[in-house]
Structure formats: structure tokens, C-alpha cells
């Protein structure tokens, strides 16, 4: 699959989707995006900058949601224009899709909305590539139905069907906890869509701080290494220069100062995995 001018897949080095959880300020976006651009360029990693103009599913009604669509898109457009980076952001309703698709390069669907058929159809018919997140409540094999819905909607409009990615972000495990079953990454290959692993939301503790979600950022490298060893097309990681003071999802954000070292390790694992191939494909059921 072609994405933002580069090839992605299990036979290609992993690409990276990264950035702050939410648009906090223009300066933070520009500084973080600039640093990530330098890091990924030095390592040869295809990179898409990510941030959200609105966090519509915060734990509490008093939590910071972002600057809103108009201002948020203006800031993301500036990052794209001045730094020359492709942009990904999430959309939360059908009404937003046209305006957002006119600015960004890749759309993302929130995990909670993966079963909303009309929403998936509308996003699929935007003409943009879409990173479709698997719901925390969904079995990995069920993502085939979600991707099939998106492809059918694209066909209706005569659009390219190979624009969809399947993203794993953990599964609910009791209350206020998520676990990552690494088998999911192999099972989701059955969708025939590139598989992306969200290493930061997978360590989230939903609602774990009462009015906001907690997280175990120290486990991000652990799960990221495991996912890359399984074999994935892309990696999603939220990052922030000061996670302790981030306005959203700080507890599970990678400190920006550690991103390069983490990516260097992941690149080594990725090369080994993809050089040696996938033995599981030779095993009979």
C-alpha cells in the first residue's frame, strides 16, 4: 500500500505516526513536529505527524478537549506547510469529515466508533487513507468486518480500496485496565490491510485517575518491542516534551527526549523480523 508517498507493509520498514495527543498550542506543535522530523529523517523512518484538534471522548466533561476544529486545523495546516510533513488527525462525527479531509493527509477513527457503520462508510468515502482503530471491546478477527465495510463503501464511490489500515490499541481487561494480546497483530493481517500498533494507548489505564485516564508509560518500550518483533507495518506513539504537564494522556506519552533511542532499538528489531520472514505462515492450523 502507498501512504503519503511511501510504501508500507510487512515487507517494508515500519513507518511512524507520532505527536502530542492533543493540539495544546501552535508552538508546542511546531517544536515537537520539528524534533520528530529531525529524528526520523536521521533514522530513515517514514513519518506522519499526529495530533488531535478535539478529544471528544475524555473521561470527564471538565477535561481539556483541544482548541476545536477551526483553530486546530489551522495549526495542523501550518505544521504541514512549514515543515513539509504529512498530517494525521482523528474525526469524531460525519459532519467533520469533509473539512478535515481538505486539510490533513490521513484520517483516523476513534476506537469507540469502529462498529458505527454509517460513520465508517463516511470516512471511507472521504478519499483519504484511514487508520481504523480496533475497539477495546472487539476481537481482533472482527476487524475484518470493519475493513470490509470500509472497502465496500469505497467501491460504491469508485475509490481506491487499498487505503485502510487496521490499528491495535489494546483490549479491555476488567475495570480501568487494558492488555495487549500480541496474537492480535498476526490475526489482523487477515484483513489484508496494513497493521499498525498503538503502543501508547495500549498502556492507558482508562478512567484510572477518576476524572482522567492514567497510564504506564514505562511499558511503552516493552510493548513496542514486542509488536515490532511480531511484525507490523506501522507504529503509533504519542509523545510530549513534558508528559507530566501534558493536557491529555500524559501518563502514557513517550517523553520526547527518549524517542530517538527507542526508535533506534525498534529499527534493529524490525530489520531482524523482516529479514527472517514469518515462520507462522508455514504452520498448518
UniProtKB/Swiss-Prot annotation:
Annotated Gene3D superfamilies: Aldolase class I
Example GO biological process: keto-3-deoxy-D-manno-octulosonic acid biosynthetic process
Record's keyword terms, sorted: Cytoplasm, Lipopolysaccharide biosynthesis, Transferase
MF terms (GO), sorted A to Z: 3-deoxy-8-phosphooctulonate synthase activity
Pfam family membership, one: DAHP_synth_1
Enzyme Commission identifier(s): 2.5.1.55
InterPro entries the record matches: Aldolase_TIM, DAHP1/KDSA, KDO8P_synthase
Predominant location: cytoplasm
Protein name in the entry: 2-dehydro-3-deoxyphosphooctonate aldolase
Encoding gene (name): kdsA
Amino acid at each position: 500500500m502507498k501512504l503519503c508517498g511511501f510504501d508500507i507493509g510487512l515487507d517494508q520498514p515500519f513507518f511512524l505516526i507520532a505527536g502530542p495527543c492533543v493540539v495544546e498550542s501552535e508552538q508546542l506543535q511546531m517544536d515537537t513536529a520539528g524534533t520528530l522530523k529531525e529524528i526520523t529523517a536521521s533514522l530513515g523512518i517514514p513519518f506522519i505527524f499526529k495530533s488531535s484538534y478535539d478529544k471528544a471522548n475524555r473521561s470527564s466533561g471538565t477535561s481539556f478537549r483541544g482548541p476545536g476544529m477551526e483553530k486546530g486545523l489551522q495549526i495542523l495546516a501550518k505544521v504541514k506547510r512549514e515543515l513539509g510533513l504529512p498530517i494525521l488527525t482523528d474525526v469524531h462525527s460525519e459532519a467533520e469529515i469533509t473539512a478535515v479531509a481538505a486539510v490533513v493527509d490521513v484520517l483516523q477513527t476513534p476506537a469507540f466508533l469502529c462498529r458505527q457503520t454509517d460513520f465508517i462508510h463516511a470516512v471511507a468515502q472521504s478519499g483519504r487513507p484511514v487508520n481504523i482503530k480496533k475497539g477495546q471491546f472487539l476481537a481482533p478477527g472482527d476487524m475484518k468486518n470493519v475493513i470490509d465495510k470500509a472497502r465496500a463503501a469505497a467501491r460504491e464511490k469508485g475509490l481506491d480500496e487499498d487505503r485502510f489500515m487496521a490499528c491495535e490499541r489494546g483490549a479491555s481487561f476488567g475495570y480501568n485496565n487494558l492488555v495487549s494480546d500480541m496474537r492480535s497483530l498476526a490475526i489482523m493481517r487477515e484483513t489484508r490491510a496494513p497493521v499498525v500498533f498503538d503502543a501508547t494507548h495500549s498502556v492507558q489505564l482508562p478512567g484510572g485517575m477518576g476524572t482522567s485516564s492514567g497510564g504506564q508509560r514505562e511499558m511503552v518500550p516493552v510493548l513496542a518491542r514486542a509488536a515490532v518483533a511480531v511484525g507490523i507495518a506501522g507504529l503509533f506513539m504519542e509523545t510530549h516534551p513534558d508528559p507530566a504537564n501534558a493536557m491529555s494522556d500524559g501518563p502514557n506519552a513517550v517523553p520526547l527526549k527518549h524517542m530517538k533511542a527507542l526508535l533506534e532499538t525498534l529499527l534493529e528489531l524490525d530489520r531482524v523480523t523482516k529479514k527472517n520472514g514469518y515462520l507462522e505462515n508455514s504452520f498448518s492450523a
